[in-house]
Amino acid sequence: TLPMNGLTARRSLDLLDLSAGQIVAVTGAAGAYGGYIIQIAKADGLTVIADASEADEALIKSLGADIVVRRGEDVATRIREHFPDGVDGIADGAVLKELVIPALCDGGSFASVRGYEGDGQRDINFTKTFVREYDGETEKLDSLRQLVEDGAITLRVADIFKPEDAPAAHRRLEAGGT
């Protein structure tokens, strides 16, 4: 999970090109990618506002989010309640696309893991995150390893299965939420 999801999160944050003190919003925050975005963003000195269900709110806070808002189609409105001028960047792990763009300030940056390019509105910088672009850049993975060793990133394990329980593990993975 660290090489794939952690590097994908690192790539997204690098594409957003935010500086310490700026604000990033994270959708799909309870997922592996979203969780890494939160933790790496905090290590980078960013302010993090993240979405979550009521059941996941404590998890998202424990990962370091400064503000947690309820997820859903009107998440952009809830983000703007905290940041009326909009956030500087969005890491869209929930693939909300045009539903979350209103939370972004004019000239902000949007990172998509599914290649969403927007329509060029409000001078927004739309980026596509492809982890393969970090192929061979071992220093990126090494920096994540260091964050783990420093305690800035926690590795989450949903459950442990015995080999004979592999079918149950696959069913759980296919059901989502792991």
Regions picked out by a protein language model, each given a short descriptive name:
Residues 1-178:
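Terminal helix/beta-alpha structural elements that buttress the NAD(P)+-binding lobe
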